[in-house]
Amino acid sequence: MKNAFKDALKAGRPQIGLWLGLANSYSAELLAGAGFDWLLIDGEHAPNNVQTVLTQLQAIAPYPSQPVVRPSWNDPVQIKQLLDVGAQTLLIPMVQNADEARNAVAATRYPPAGIRGVGSALARASRWNRIPDYLHQANDAMCVLVQIETREAMSNLASILDVDGIDGVFIGPADLSADMGFAGNPQHPEVQAAIENAIVQIRAAGKAPGILMANEALAKRYLELGALFVAVGVDTTLLARGAEALAARFGAEKKLSGASGVY
């Protein structure tokens, strides 16, 4: 078993991604052919469940883009289901400390290394037990990325980085800026300083730093600092702003107030 995304991070090859929030397999397949290295299927803020994640994994599978799945929470039951339908790389939200990071890793590993339940006869991940020795290969193919999104998590970053099995740490600029008192303004100098310091610290620890940033200048800055998995856009934003701009160019009567938001 292989995990091309995990291998790329280990090799230090920057991976450029796109966020998927439309919760639809047709749009996921369309975007899988756009040339991004990875696509984030969002189960935290988009209306996804295990079934819709499955159909998007199936839609993306024939393409080079690698899927990353974000569950709604650091929940071992939900993680088990996502792994069974074929997710190999998970982005775990709101990890605050090393204990929570260890729990995330344990949820992705079969015993004795972890607590993942064994149900491979029912699992797409094992191709319904057609992958030889799946139970002994699966652990090494898992890629665990944890999100730090608060001042508390930032203060615990060093201990989180010490957790065995953590492949990367993703900085959540929207929640971090809100927690720091600058909601809706991740470009505030204090927030930017925290982000840049974290990227350098994560990379120095031998882990992969990641972030979502639609501002192209900032995204390139993070890559220069050593970020290895950077999402540079969101499908819902691309569609909404593109449609609004097209309507405006043809003098559409409905006048929209200026769109706002972090991404």
Swiss-Prot record:
Belongs to the HpcH/HpaI aldolase family. The record marks 84 as: Increases basicity of active site His. GO terms for molecular function: 4-hydroxy-2-ketopimelate aldolase activity; metal ion binding. The record marks 70 as: Transition state stabilizer. GO terms for biological process: 4-hydroxyphenylacetate catabolic process; phenylacetate catabolic process. The gene is hpcH. PANTHER family: 2-KETO-3-DEOXY-L-RHAMNONATE ALDOLASE, PHOSPHOENOLPYRUVATE CARBOXYLASE FAMILY PROTEIN. Homohexamer; trimer of dimers. Its EC number is 4.1.2.52. Keywords: Aromatic hydrocarbons catabolism, Lyase, Metal-binding. Pfam families: HpcH_HpaI. This is 4-hydroxy-2-oxo-heptane-1,7-dioate aldolase. Substrate binds at residues 147, 174-175. The active site is at 45 (proton acceptor). Catalyzes the reversible retro-aldol cleavage of 4-hydroxy-2-ketoheptane-1,7-dioate (HKHD) to pyruvate and succinic semialdehyde. GO terms for cellular component: cytoplasm. It comes from Salmonella paratyphi B (strain ATCC BAA-1250 / SPB7). Its cofactor is a divalent metal cation. Binds 1 divalent metal cation per subunit. It catalyses: 4-hydroxy-2-oxoheptanedioate = succinate semialdehyde + pyruvate. It is an enzyme of class 4 (lyase).
